[in-house]
Amino acid sequence: MAKSKKGLRKVLFAHSAGPQYGRGKGSYDLVMYLKSKLSGEFEIHFPVIEKPRLPTYEKFKKMFGWAFAAITEPVILIGHSLGGSTLLKYLSEERPAIAASALFLISTPHWKSDMNEFELKTNFQAFLKDIPAVFLYHSKNDTEAPFENLKFYKGAFKTAIVRELPGKEHIFSNGLPELVTDIKSLPQQGKSHSL
């Protein structure tokens, strides 16, 4: 990941499962929405794993490895759906040498032993406790990642700002205004956490 353009704050977006390019595909619409709403202030990086139709943790781990190796300044982290859970797993287990200024998790599933490849270790959040701001977003009637997943993350991140959203959105094709507002509310030169 190249150094961000002068004056722009860097955002790394970890995508959902499935195809990622084109309207209605995975995280694509949400990323395009964020780029349109945050342009001029933020630079959004949207790396995609190899063959996203067949996601594995190893593919995400490889992608995060090269993406984080290129980060030289504080970064805002966003994880959407599977991208959120793999981002948490990577951050807590690999502990990359980055400065995270905030963590945003959208429609993030909590994998149990039936999907142990993506399962988080017990007390994973202990390795992330110094991230200055954690935000959680989940639709009350999400059919892809049921609402009870949010309860798990609320318990793990006790000081998180939680946005319980009406409806059943999971991919947020029409955008997520609350996310834009929260990103813009971050302090300009706020604290960051080195993992």
Residue ranges and their predicted role:
Residues 78-88:
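Gly/Ala-rich beta-loop-alpha elbow adjacent to hydrolase catalytic centers
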Residues 43, 154-171:
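Catalytic histidine neighborhood in serine/cysteine hydrolases
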Residues 97-111:
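A conserved short beta-strand
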Residues 2-53:
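Short, surface-exposed "cap/lid" segments of acyl-processing enzymes
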Residues 67-70, 175-195:
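Catalytic active-site module of serine/aspartate enzymes centered on a nucleophile-bearing elbow/loop
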Residues 55, 168-180:
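Catalytic histidine-centered segment of alpha/beta-hydrolase-like enzymes
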Residues 143-149:
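Conserved alpha/beta-hydrolase "acid-adjacent" motif
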Residues 130, 135-138, 142:
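Short beta-strand/loop motif that positions the catalytic acidic residue
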